[in-house]
């Protein structure tokens, strides 16, 4: 299981700064696609090839509201789902009454808690940490979220217990499909339609949380695992802040899966929550199929409106196949596995270095890179750097100055010429290094003696 790390603490201790610092450590896709929505309260991150999900639970103790009440409403869902809790405090302000109340509330959860003393740059770390010893938390880390100090060692320690578990999870040969979508969009109904039996209980109870359900499934001699992520069933009266964290189970399933099937509701169109889920799937680099459910019975005018909205709002996900289905009646469901298999095989496909290099040369010849300070950016060669998603590593000169628009051009051209369907493509750029950079020219002994003779001769001549 992909670990979930929750950030908790009173306001202004640096949770959002730490969240941004950690989520930026991942190698993002080629660029920030226009229109791509990223929810800033939960994110996918990676540290030294170890993936995890991080959740910012927000500030606790605002306006003197009782801490236990806030913990039970805003943060309890996220903290209960978390494998590790990072309790942030301010090393400059020292221990406060709210910090003590939060520590007391965290003890009741029986979770692994790390105390993270932030803002220790420029001050004595030992003295800053000593002020918080009375909280009784044994694992204490001094960091600077704004400057990045201490974060790498913090992540190494908290992720260490999950390394074996993460490696074991990659050994399964079955294709894992995560059914992602908002509550009541029809995920369980679709899985039941695929299985041909009522394997998943379909119900709607406000505030009810269910774990993800993994169901082994064989179709045409291929093995699959269908992952249903029911999450929290919400009604309008449920606190909106709680609803924010109802997707944590879905995020874990997305990280575990090979292919994500994002289910949309044709009656409601594309919502902000749909866009957040889609953004997380793309940032995770997973193969993607989009299914628009409840398509039957809609008037033609409404269908055209939905298609127009899909084209306008999902243009950055144009690599994904879109299929219009009815999970209840079965129309369009049969073609989903064709799209899923196509996306999976694109995601794991291999390409030789000569093929990628020739393609890079053809693409750059068609539209040459720009000149920087009178020198043209050179793209020398390309090779495959990974799978699911496919990673292409491009080597050259002055690649740091390559415009984002040209990176998008390369991305689109590679997807088109390689015939990739249903998977994002990740491109990494590595600049050529001068082997003589930062190296001082060392004279031989003969050259040193000659230099001394010349200096003596010049001195005597004066």
Curated annotation (Swiss-Prot):
Classification via Gene3D superfamilies: 3.30.300.20, P-loop containing nucleotide triphosphate hydrolases
Biological process annotations from GO: ribosome biogenesis
TM regions (residue ranges): none
Domain named KH-like: residues: 349-433
Sites where the protein binds GTP 2: 181-188, 228-232, 293-296
Alphabetized HAMAP family for the sequence: GTPase_Der (MF_00195)
Protein known as: GTPase Der
Species whose genome carries this gene: Legionella pneumophila (strain Lens)
Lineage: Bacteria, Pseudomonadati, Pseudomonadota, Gammaproteobacteria, Legionellales
